[in-house]
């Protein structure tokens, strides 16, 4: 049986998700809700095989070991710590990651 991880979402990531909803909802509230539900489903899949997701390209520059899950135009930045998957941020794919985004 595959190992199951506990997925934890930081306050910063929760705020990112709320911001994404607000941005999409300006034009299409129903689409915003549907997108967020699907995004949360995708995040939930990290309970199993989070290693399937690639490392973020910024790791070399930042000296970190973060991975990302891509969905739509967004990437969910996370790290694996023992049996936990910690969701650090949910960012637009064009946005580069820096250490200030990961503090907190």
What is the predicted function of each stretch?
Residues 26-29, 65, 88-90, 97:
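Short, low-complexity, polar/charged sequence segments that are solvent-exposed and flexible
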Residues 1-64:
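Basic, Lys/Arg-enriched alpha-helical interface segments
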């Amino acid at each position: 049986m595959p190992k199951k991880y506990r997925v934890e979402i930081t306050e910063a990531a929760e705020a990112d998700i709320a911001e994404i909803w607000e941005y999409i909802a300006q034009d299409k509230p129903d689409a915003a809700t549907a997108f967020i539900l699907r995004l949360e489903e995708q995040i939930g899949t990290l309970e199993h095989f989070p290693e399937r997701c690639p490392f973020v390209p910024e790791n070399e520059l930042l000296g970190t070991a973060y991975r990302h899950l891509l969905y739509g135009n967004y990437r969910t930045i996370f790290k694996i710590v023992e049996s936990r998957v910690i969701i650090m941020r949910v960012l637009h794919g064009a946005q580069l990651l820096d250490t200030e985004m990961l503090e907190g």
